[in-house]
Amino acid sequence: MEDPAHSRTRRLPTTRRSRPSPGAVAGWGLAAGVPLAFLAVFFAWPVLTLVGRGFLPDGALDLSGFADVFSAPRTWRLLGLTLAQGVLGTAFAVLLGVPGAYVLYRCRFPGRELVRAFVTVPFVLPTVVVGVAFRTLLVEGGPLGLLGLDGTFPAIVAALVFFNYTVVVRTVGGMWERLDPRPEQAARSLGAPPWRAFTTVTLPALTPAIASAAAIVFLFCATAFGIVLVLGGLRFGTIETEIWVQTTQFLDLRAAAVLSVVQLVVVGASLWFSARARQRRERALDLRTDPAAARPLRLLERTGGRLRPGADLAPAAVTALVVVGLLALPLVNLLVRSFRASGTWSLANYVNLGTTGGANALSVTVWEATANSLRIAVDATLIAVTVGTLVALVVSRRPRSRPARRAIGALDSLFMLPLGVSAVTVGFGFLLTLNEGPVDLRGSAVVVPIAQAVVAVPIVVRTVLPVLRAIDPRLRQAAAVLGATPGRVLLTVDGPFLVRGLGLALGFAFAVSLGEFGATSFLARPESPTLPVVIFRLIGRPGADNYGMALAASVVLAVVTATVMAVAGRLRGDRMGEW
């Protein structure tokens, strides 16, 4: 018997689209123009200015910087380390994340939703906190200090996998839970062993999602800043950290400009591959059968009274090991170590948060820095959600003309650029551009929120966009046929779906802003630093008290971030964003 709901959806009227009214054209033009103006003023202008200072030092084009930079052996070493950490971080994240996607999205077991929520926590943690957590774990005297991994390249790769594991789990798992299991079951019934059924049936169907996740993870790994700086220092520098070194320590804008261009090439290639993979994934999802057919399997399901070790036990064991050993251990150790001072259990580290540290290491107390971070993050979140929602509304449209579709695709890719361009480049570019003329923001309280919003906008877009693209276009057509104006269609059809995605978008934007370090380290005024900046200063100062305060401050920042995401998770609808 046909499902009545499905029947009603199928019978929605399909009419020819009329030409949009001038008011609708003006409205959509404004919706696209405001974000483009924001991106042009607060991203393109600062970045291009910094690059221009390097290539046009005396007003004339000078490309000799490329020869100077690429003739230095250090540059090739940095490029090799950048690509190596990107490739290795991506490979391990995918290898460990695919079993996690199966367990958390295709199997049922008590506490599954709790584990799903927990694996999301590392991704939203500030990178400085992640670096401190792994450093505390691997330092001499730490639980894993005997391994001798403190300050090594494997430690950086492990921290990157910790940070990006959830990207693979959520992206692949979101598609896996919608796959119809019957083709794999048919292969099994024909005698194929579990591994063969998976590699010949399920894995090809998951390839678009895996490729999309891998492209994003590579982007995050190759452009990591806080994690590399805390764990590797300058010994294992990357292009990202080298841009910071050249701008802050040597003021060599030409070298920084060349490295920024190199990074833009890497980022552009990653974004192009990610966009292609994402399109394939969306087309694949459109071809899936009724989601009701994709019934979650009971973990360790019995077949003929015996466990299926190849199908259930192996991925369950890998996932349990990752969750406990890779995700939980650094966080638990950070929490435990924050209560140790002078070799005894104590609250001294937390009490010291009300001071400026040993030898006045800070200009404000940690609690004052926390208040600064919260206030700035609220402002940045409002800006990012406003701009990101406008972008998502425009990009979610499905025009009939090919030029319009290409323009929308270009707009989508354009607003992904802040994800990969060095936050250091953006921050230093702010100092060069927003200090004169009509946009003189020197000393303004809005400059840091704007810089953080630039970084958070792509996250908002990628969170809200899947929700809007899930809307059946026939719903909009039906509303228009019934006489609704374009504005009313947007309010009554898109509005309810948009509200479902805004909760998670608010949480992600707030978490990203709260933990942003690269641009903020340039722009935060000495009398009003943010919490990540304060933590980095504390771990760079000698003294056990300062280090203990850094641990306690990291716990505070992690707890605030996790709390915000927990509240955002309660506000979201049943459909999650891409990450």
Predicted feature descriptions by range:
Residues 1-34, 274-321, 399-406, 568-579:
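Transmembrane alpha-helical segments of polytopic membrane transport and secretion proteins
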Residues 25-59, 71-177, 205-226, 230-232, ...:
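Membrane-water interface segments at the C-terminal ends of transmembrane alpha-helices
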Residues 79, 191-193, 200, 370, ...:
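Polytopic alpha-helical membrane proteins, predominantly small-molecule transporters/carriers
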Residues 107, 177-206, 249, 355, ...:
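Short helix-to-coil transition segments within interhelical loops
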Residues 226-251, 341-345, 517-547, 577:
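Glycine-rich helix-loop "coupling/hinge" segments at transmembrane-helix boundaries
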Residues 471-475:
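A donor-sugar binding/catalytic signature common to diverse glycosyltransferases
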